[in-house]
């Protein structure tokens, strides 16, 4: 796993990832990262915090909200708890946030906003994994179906009711944009929950989200690809030998065996999956660095208007 948090710009494939600040001592993504001082603000005006940026406040509101705590009892793959080892959507969201902060830091993006979107990205999921969402979508078909991203927006803009002055968490435009669009532009007929809020506070749903939100989306992919393997091995749904038949994972196991020939089963599989995890993170950083260097964005709006994602796998 990558340990440093800044990259010398642009990424140079001949020397690999290098970390640090630019020649003027400033993070390289400064021009196109989301600046909290330039935020488009909240739907309901609030006094600024003495100690926290607006994105930090968003993150803290998400962590302390009821919906975030309820993620403890929701899963992605397994339909019910079969022990305390398997991931829940709460532990998954924490892992996504960790990966997202690392990538954002390397690319010079705003790590606070990236972490905030990562922590919020699963708030709209129902219980019982993907099967639960499919069942709920079928039941809600007469009312427009069910969409977990739209439900997440509904939760943070309406259903959380703790504050005296407004319903919801009154998050910044940038955080709401990231929750709604981290997987890309929202096209076609809008779910009513998203359409209702968008009429009040236009999230520009047809465009791409900030690079910070895009990082959160890819961090989600990295986290679940990695922990699904951990959980699947623990549940004995497949074996390490079956995983080693896959070329990328085969190289990970081979590297571990070459360096640590006498590891026990548990340590061997953990070391191999650590390497797989690192490969995914470094791939996103390398490809995204190249994309950003090619685009040479001068501000965050250049990212939104790019016409394609800037944060990608190879």
Predicted regions and their residues:
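Post-HEXXH active-site segment of zinc metalloproteases
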Residues: 116, 127-142, 234-238
